[in-house]
């Protein structure tokens, strides 16, 4: 009887240990899932992996005679009552040449709405060579009822594009944006104005 009781206690302890281990693993997996999204975004922005374009501060110093066609795609996620489209569907540019195109957004709703865009490039490998000098991605945008907004994109294709053997047959690059609904952005406090008020002026 005593041996049976001891065995039952050992079994309960073993079950408890397994339960704790499973719970810990589950919690860790949930945390990793939440952390993986921003980490993956950072990784893609740095490397151009997965069709993420490169953000640069300067223009290309080299312009080649070789040209490539760039197409523009626009999408709206569920819950955002906007009309969103490129003002030009495609352009043919010289590789290394800086080009500006524009998208436009229109609020179809009777109230103020808020959106933020993400982007992607196809084929994915071309993202490492698609350099944006100016864009509206990851910026909070507010549109009043019926308001229109022009959204410029300034870009060039890195001349190193032609040296990548995996892209030798690529004649067209597609830049795609998707707008998602977001909560109303919090107002930015003017620190100077607050300080002046506290000082009596």
UniProtKB/Swiss-Prot annotation:
GO terms for biological process: respiratory chain complex IV assembly. Exerts its effect at some terminal stage of cytochrome c oxidase synthesis, probably by being involved in the insertion of the copper B into subunit I. One of its GO terms (cellular component) is plasma membrane. Residues 1-13 are cytoplasmic. It comes from Brucella ovis (strain ATCC 25840 / 63/290 / NCTC 10512). InterPro entries: CtaG/Cox11_dom_sf, Cyt_c_oxidase_assmbl_CtaG. The keyword Glycoprotein does not apply. This is Cytochrome c oxidase assembly protein CtaG. Residues 37-201 are periplasmic.
